[in-house]
A protein has these predicted regions:
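Surface-exposed peri-terminal alpha-helical interaction modules
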Residues: 1-202
Length: 202
């Protein structure tokens, strides 16, 4: 499912770069459904009790979600950038290069802001000319742009619909992360995660 999400997000970025928002609506609707599938998979893990989990915990060794380059790609497409997160892939040339490229490229949201700037919206320069490897910092001027779009949805329909689709996938991603935390909390409490993370606090 993550491979499909990566494929779709890559396509969405290409369409925004080409000033084609309408294909993104179907693409992001599909990404949302993929996210729902991933969300529901936690239900299986939630059936594990701590005592059941500890029976095979040692088999996992140091295996961790940290090792999923596709998940990291999804995070980068969504704008959750952290250069430290790709160090684990340093010995995997193809994956590392791909993640380096995404780390230093605009996220899907960044590309949308660039699109809005190209189409005459007064997007602050610091939102479209910045270090893409850093997480996005909210700007009051961007809020005003979105207010303009939402005050006149029929005049800016494609931009309006794109905003809604981005909110959809952001919401699903937040729900997935929350369920991840609650599942970890339920099964291992506040113990160290398999990859050496601080577990729930992480």
């Amino acid at each position: 499912w993550m491979k499909l999400a990566v494929h779709e997000l890559r396509a969405a970025v290409a369409h925004v770069q080409a000033d084609e928002l309408s294909p993104c609506f179907k693409i992001l609707a599909r990404v949302k459904q993929v996210q729902r599938m991933l969300f529901e998979q936690w239900a299986v893990l939630e059936t594990l009790t701590p005592s059941e989990y500890v029976q095979f915990r040692n088999v996992l060794g140091a295996a961790s979600g940290f090792q999923s380059h596709q998940f990291r790609m999804i995070e980068f497409y969504f704008g959750n950038k952290d250069a430290r997160s790709i160090g684990v892939f340093a010995n995997h040339e193809v994956e590392y290069a791909e993640l380096q490229r995404l780390l230093n490229a605009p996220s899907l949201y960044d590309e949308f802001l660039i699109y809005l700037a190209r189409h005459g919206f007064d997007v602050p320069a610091e939102s479209v000319n910045r270090d893409w490897s850093q997480p996005y910092t909210p700007q009051p001027g961007v809020i005003q742009v979105f207010k303009q779009i939402y005050d006149n949805p029929h005049e800016h329909w494609d931009a309006y619909e794109m905003c809604e689709k981005l909110v959809d996938v952001e919401e699903q991603f937040s729900l997935w992360r929350f369920r991840h935390v609650k599942t970890v909390e339920r099964i291992i409490g506040f113990k160290t995660g398999t990859g050496g993370s601080s577990g729930v606090p992480f």
